[in-house]
């Protein structure tokens, strides 16, 4: 039987194209994010600027209901390659023996802020210009809305209460409400007295006329400067393929962070258009600018910022792992 030369050529071409597609097919990396907060800024920027594709990866991103603990549970189950969570929650999990390691600092700054309702201001007579101790004391008995009980917002709220002499367990009431839009609605409708969220949420509440920024931990507590607040967490023992995906994902986020630093307004506009359409441009731009000093160092950990983290964790009641291998820079190429 004679096969026409054209058929052979077309078949060979098809095989060649198929092989080519196999070669260039992007590998998937899965990242779970505990809350849809802007403070995970390098990740938002990497998505907005599509830098995952630039490093040969296809991102499978998931917002995981339940906050930090749920994101870490997904990591433990092998459902995701990386969890984007609060560093204190990661430390607590590692201290309990879970096989995790912090691999990248998404934001080396305490970005969470305490915003309170108008009724609370009226009831207590406190103002944002009062001494810090008086502002903290105004939170006594307040209902503070968070995305997840036991998560970073919860821990920070209780730590702040303790700094003013309140009992961190009973001095405030912490209520799980949900993601930021639900928390905003709860404050606006007087179902909670306060929330602990990152920008742009303080700007949103102020623009809506129902919330006032009362405590800004980064400004009010100098001991928190440099804190690696939000981190990427991986399993402690990734195989070679997973390690390559992790390194590539970090490179993509470094590129995203570099874009933010180079042109904050452009980054804010892109992120807003893609993911935060409910936020006005001036508020979004101000929020991005407020986080720029948390993007230094290329996401690397240092002895200095780990010391800040361990001190904060000890003060907030978070156990610190006995071992010293709960963080690493080995996946960061440059």
Spans of model-derived segments:
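C-terminal segment of N-terminal export signals and the immediately downstream linker at the start
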Residues: 1, 19-32
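N-terminal export signals
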Residues: 7-24
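Short, glycine-/small- and polar/acidic-enriched structural segments
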Residues: 26-167, 175-176, 193-199
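Sec/Tat-exported extracytoplasmic proteins
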Residues: 50, 79, 84, 94, ...
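Short, solvent-exposed loop/beta-turn-alpha elements that line the ligand-binding surface or hinge
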Residues: 54, 121-127, 219-225, 292-302
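Pocket-lining segment of extracytoplasmic ligand-binding domains
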Residues: 181-272
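Secondary-structure end/capping motifs
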Residues: 239-318
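Conserved C-terminal helix/tail region of periplasmic/extracytoplasmic solute-binding proteins
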Residues: 310-334
């Amino acid at each position: 039987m004679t096969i026409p030369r054209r058929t052979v050529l077309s078949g060979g071409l098809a095989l060649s194209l198929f092989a080519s597609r196999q070669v260039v097919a992007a590998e998937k990396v899965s990242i779970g994010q505990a809350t849809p907060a802007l403070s995970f800024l390098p990740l938002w920027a990497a998505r907005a600027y599509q830098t995952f594709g630039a490093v040969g990866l296809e991102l499978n991103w998931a917002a995981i209901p339940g906050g930090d603990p749920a994101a870490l549970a997904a990591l433990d189950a092998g459902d995701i390659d990386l969890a984007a969570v609060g560093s204190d929650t990661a430390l607590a999990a590692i201290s309990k023996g879970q096989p995790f390691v912090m691999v990248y600092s998404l934001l080396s700054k305490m970005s969470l802020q305490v915003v309170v309702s108008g009724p609370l201001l009226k009831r207590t007579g406190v103002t944002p210009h009062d001494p810090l101790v008086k502002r903290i004391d105004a939170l006594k008995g307040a209902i503070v809305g968070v995305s997840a009980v036991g998560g970073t917002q919860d821990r920070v709220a209780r730590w702040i209460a303790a700094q003013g002499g309140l009992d961190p367990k009973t001095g405030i009431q912490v209520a799980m409400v949900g993601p930021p839009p639900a928390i905003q609605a709860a404050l606006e409708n007087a179902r909670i007295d306060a929330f602990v969220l990152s920008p742009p949420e303080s700007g949103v509440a102020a623009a809506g006329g129902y919330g006032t920024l009362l405590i800004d931990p980064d400004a009010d507590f100098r001991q928190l400067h440099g804190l690696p607040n939000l981190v990427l967490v991986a399993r402690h023992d990734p195989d070679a393929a997973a390690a390559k995906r992790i390194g590539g994902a970090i490179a993509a986020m470094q590129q995203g962070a570099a874009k933010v630093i180079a042109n904050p307004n452009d980054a804010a506009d892109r992120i807003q258009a893609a993911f935060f359409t409910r936020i006005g441009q001036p508020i979004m731009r101000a929020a991005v600018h407020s986080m720029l000093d948390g993007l230094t160092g290329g996401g690397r950990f240092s002895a200095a910022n780990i010391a800040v983290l361990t001190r904060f964790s000890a003060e907030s009641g978070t156990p610190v792992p006995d071992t010293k291998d709960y963080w690493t820079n080995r996946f960061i190429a440059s």
